[in-house]
Amino acid sequence: MSSLLLSSISTFFIVLSAVLVAIGWALVKNKKIEAHKKTMFAAAISALTFFIIYVSRTLFIGNTAFGGPDEYKIYYTIFLVFHIILATTGAVFGIVTILAGYKNNLVRHRKIGPVTSIIWFFTAITGVMVYLLLYII
């Protein structure tokens, strides 16, 4: 498989995870707790699928160097740096939030859940921008 195809598939899964997080957030706001749990679990699986594809692509194919126009390289670099920071932070917050929910530590889960969600939304947005700048533009 090509780097472009694997990157396209992994980008789909990270966007899917963000969409599912948004749906899960709306569900919990409407007191649909069981649907929230299932949707957030699906979001976590989608994010994990992204991560597995990303790591596999990196290990077996390698990183893709920026090959676009020089005037876009600074934007690519800025989005990439922010994406790496957000993705790392979001992953840690995500694990802590999920564990708090499954351990029924709802005070902690409710406190950090919205923060985690917002970080994840920005992670997905910056990830899509990195993808677009690397493969499309």
Residue ranges and their predicted role:
Residues 1-137:
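Alpha-helical membrane insertion/targeting regions
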